[in-house]
UniProtKB/Swiss-Prot annotation:
InterPro entries: TB2_DP1_HVA22 (IPR004345). Belongs to the DP1 family. This is Protein YOP1. The chain crosses the membrane at residues 36-55, 57-76, 87-103, 106-124. GO terms for cellular component: endoplasmic reticulum membrane; Golgi membrane. The short lumenal loops between transmembrane domains 1 and 2 and between transmembrane domains 3 and 4 may impart a wedge-like configuration, thus deforming membranes. The gene is YOP1. It comes from Pyricularia oryzae (strain 70-15 / ATCC MYA-4617 / FGSC 8958). It is a multi-pass membrane protein. Required to generate and maintain the structure of the tubular endoplasmic reticulum network and the vacuole. Induces high curvature in membranes and causes membrane tubule formation. Involved in membrane/vesicle trafficking. The keyword Endoplasmic reticulum applies.
C-alpha cells in the first residue's frame, strides 16, 4: 500500500508532465526556480482561498465561468467537429440563464460561502468531463422551452406561397 506522500508525488509528477507542454510554464520554472506543478497548485489554492473568503469572489467566479468556457468555445469554433460546438452553445445558454436568475434573486446576502458554491457549480457546468450544462439543459430548460422552439412548419408558413399561387390563378 502506498503512502499518501507517494501518491501526492505521483500526482505532482503527472501534473508536471502535463504542464511541460506549455512553454510559458517551462520559462517560469527556469526563471524562478519553482517547479511548475507547485506554482500551478499554489495559484489554484490561492484562487480558491480568495473565493472562499470572498476577496473578489464575484469577479473570480465570473472569470472562471467565462475564461475556461471561452477558451474551449473558441477551440470548438476552429475545429471541424460540430459536436463540441453544440456542447459549448448549450453551456452559454445555461450560463446566461443562471446569470439572469442570479441577478434577479439576491442570494448572495443570505447564502454563506455563495461564491465558493457558485465556483464549483460553474466548474461542473463547464468542464467537458462532467457536461453539467448538458444535464441542466436536458433536465430543466429543454422541457420548459422546447414548446416555444418547435421546428415543424406552422400553418402560416405556406401562406405567402398560397397567396402567390392564388394570384396567378386569377
Amino acid at each position: 500500500m502506498s503512502s499518501p506522500q507517494d501518491r501526492a508525488q505521483y500526482y505532482i509528477g503527472q501534473l508536471d508532465r502535463e504542464l511541460s507542454k506549455y512553454p510559458a510554464l517551462n520559462n517560469l520554472e527556469r526563471t524562478t526556480g519553482v517547479p511548475k506543478a507547485y506554482a500551478v497548485v499554489g495559484v489554484v489554492v490561492l484562487y480558491f482561498f480568495l473565493i472562499v473568503f470572498n476577496l473578489g469572489g464575484q469577479l473570480l467566479t465570473n472569470i472562471a465561468g467565462f475564461g475556461i468556457p471561452a477558451y474551449y468555445s473558441l477551440d470548438a469554433l476552429f475545429s471541424a467537429n460540430k459536436e463540441d460546438d453544440t456542447q459549448w452553445l448549450t453551456y452559454w445558454v445555461v450560463f446566461a440563464m443562471f446569470t439572469v436568475v442570479e441577478s434577479l434573486v439576491s442570494v448572495v446576502y443570505w447564502f454563506p460561502f455563495y461564491y465558493m458554491f457558485k465556483f464549483v457549480f460553474l466548474l461542473w457546468l463547464s468542464l467537458p468531463a462532467f457536461k453539467g450544462a448538458d444535464i441542466i439543459f436536458r433536465s430543466f430548460l429543454a422541457p420548459t422551452l422546447s414548446r416555444y422552439f418547435v421546428h415543424s412548419r406552422p400553418a402560416s408558413s405556406n401562406l405567402r406561397a398560397k397567396a402567390d399561387s392564388a394570384g396567378k390563378a386569377e
